[in-house]
Amino acid sequence: MKKINRNKPVPWTVLSLALAATILMLGLQPRTSLAEDLVVYKSPTCGCCKKWVKHMRDNGFNVVVHEQYNVTPKKDEYGVPRRLRSCHTAKIGGYVVEGHVPADVVKQLLEEKPAIAGLAVPGMPMGSPGMEGFRKDPYDVISFTSTGKTGIHASR
């Protein structure tokens, strides 16, 4: 009968502990990307749109960009009310995201799943993601339904 040396750990025990520690650490790490793509339609010449895309990527979104000079047909297709339109249009999780909507508001939208068509930040307010500069203007994130009903979803 072979004698076990208590001073030398059994390889399977060490391997099991290492595997358990790895699984635990992976489970505790924050998500770095969301499962579904954020599909963005924007003009290839728009600098603030590029900055908004970077903001979304920096906040864990996997962004797929479609560059086209005329984004209006996508806005029409997705039912974005004319008074809420901005420079770029995106879609994720069945929702429309119009303009410079902050990443945390989009994450909240995807978690809460309200009965709306999407969110919009009309125009291009200074201080919104992608429009950072020397000043920060207050702005609202507007929710809208497929029938055109709107409401203030968040204020910044």
Which functions belong to the PLM regions below?
Residues 1-8:
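N-terminal secretory signal peptides that target proteins for export/translocation
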Residues 16-25:
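Bacterial N-terminal signal peptides
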Residues 34-53, 57-59:
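Local sequence-structure signature of Cys/Sec-based thiol-disulfide redox active-site neighborhoods
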Residues 37-38, 61-63, 93-96:
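Short active-site oxyanion
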Residues 45, 52, 67-70, 102-106:
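Stable alpha-helical elements in mature extracytoplasmic
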Residues 53-73:
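Conserved helix-turn-beta segment immediately C-terminal to the redox Cys motif
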Residues 77, 83-156:
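Thiol/selenol-based redox catalytic cores and closely related redox-interacting motifs
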